[in-house]
């Protein structure tokens, strides 16, 4: 049976159909918002997966280019692997849902979001979060707490829910809020230096709208939801837990109170060896249970230390940032480098400048077609002292790279101010928490070192949270390190300048954050950010005045847009010849701006500009030009007076005396003065050498 429910969000209709498609899925829904349609399918395995210590949730977000009436580019002409944006959207769906599954649930769960139709006013990724939550709630999978999502914009001082394309062009804030009816679950934001009070108000504004969508989901579940399966939850054997904890608690506690990370880990390894010696024979088939008890004991000790003893594992105050060092220019041949170290977290970011033709071309469902500024993040195994194959960037690397990219994006100079493509690559050299925000700091250092005139330096910080089981008691922590992130309840990343916030990403391991926690985290992040910015400015207070000698050089000229075809030529013949002759890159914009770039040949840039200026310069009747003879005939000589512009000197106009043969006066390759005597209605140019000589003689007499 087909069921349909509707509600209104921001003045537009949100509709859900189920029972219409995917008859064999546990739950399959068609969800639409305006003309944007996403199909969501949710399924779970019947039995828990054995031999794992995590919840195997898989979220897929598939963009179909037919949704915007496009055929994929390239040779194959079909969608390939997920784009970076699809991966980011899948992660955004995963983060608010994962904490709401029962603890110990080990069944494989897959949620597939397929984008079928897109109206650019209504973002499919926002619809997919709502649809994924609703599909899970309608299914028999043990997920019972609905989550809603909205986008919030800020235009002319007014908050807007789910802004349209026109509104997004003018907004200074791009915020996504996910929440249950009681608490905020996840936030992602990019903004043009938004102050903390405004950001908090925007989050709360989105939270209120989320409550209405949650109510809509609850109504659907009450009417049409399936009976929930009783989950089989993993739990360590009670006898194993009791014996191992009794034997090892004090030893683990002693190890966890060691402030130095290497010493602490070494001591923990010794404790684990003792536990293994004690129980390996008795519980040889309970190895996973023993590991689970050790993990739970460590977690209990660290959380108690933070929550009840007001003590951090490394002895810092709760609002204290780890020791910071900054360096620039450490690589001799790159265009800009920054090395940022915060405690045991260290990131080196390298900036590379390129021509405008080096932009990244995007082939997706969004209207954006290219990207001039990009940031890539690499997290090799050696950064945590481990050994594993290097197989290219995973979802985490793509997500962290995008987060740091968003933090700097509002500060990047415009194309007219700085006519270069900019690529940043952050190499994580050592990781002990908050590498994405260290990448923001490293990126700032690299951009300043490269001479990129960013508006202001930016820095990032990660805030953490520890809460009691009843959520009544909570402590916000500044600059979390690995152990606090691993055993804590929140990763609240905030980046920005001294003026305001440029990016936020936070998610939780619990069932949401209180409003006061959100506010405290924003204020704590501001204090820490200003401290870090001070350290960055001590290292390099402003962008370098000169680009690296190894960086390309770009010059800009402006021509009449009507003359663009003259520069390009038939089939690109003219522009390709200029590029080949001068060894430059040329980018032409529709408004007549031409960007000429060369890596190491400034003379090539000058020559190319001279040719382009000649091609676009108008031939003026009555003016005298120094031209080159390109061809002779029995009736005259053809002379090139400007690049690509030739005229005819009739044999009668070559000299004052009668000329019997053209070659008696001029030859191919000769440079001669000529005067433009006429330009006919077909654009043909008539020249006179005789009149040019006469005019020059006349000027001499004066």
Curated annotation (Swiss-Prot):
Disulfide bonds: none annotated. One of its GO terms (biological process) is RNA catabolic process. It is an enzyme of class 2 (transferase). It comes from the Bacteria. Mg(2+) binds at residues 485, 491. Residues 552-612 form the KH domain. Gene3D superfamilies: GHMP Kinase, N-terminal domain, K Homology domain, type 1, Nucleic acid-binding proteins. The keyword Cell cycle does not apply. It is found in: Cytoplasm. Pfam families: KH_1 (PF00013), PNPase (PF03726), RNase_PH (PF01138), RNase_PH_C (PF03725), S1 (PF00575). SMART domains: KH, S1. Its cofactor is Mg(2+). GO terms for cellular component: cytosol. It catalyses: RNA(n+1) + phosphate = RNA(n) + a ribonucleoside 5'-diphosphate. Its EC number is 2.7.7.8. Coiled coil: none annotated. GO terms for molecular function: 3'-5'-RNA exonuclease activity; magnesium ion binding; polyribonucleotide nucleotidyltransferase activity; RNA binding. Keywords: Cytoplasm, Magnesium, Metal-binding, Nucleotidyltransferase, RNA-binding, Transferase. The keyword Nucleus does not apply. Residues 622-690 form the S1 motif domain. InterPro entries: ExoRNase_PH_dom1, ExoRNase_PH_dom2, ExoRNase_PH_dom2_sf, KH_dom, KH_dom_type_1, KH_dom_type_1_sf, NA-bd_OB-fold, PNPase. Involved in mRNA degradation. Catalyzes the phosphorolysis of single-stranded polyribonucleotides processively in the 3'- to 5'-direction. Belongs to the polyribonucleotide nucleotidyltransferase family. This is Polyribonucleotide nucleotidyltransferase. It comes from Clostridium botulinum (strain Hall / ATCC 3502 / NCTC 13319 / Type A). The gene is pnp.
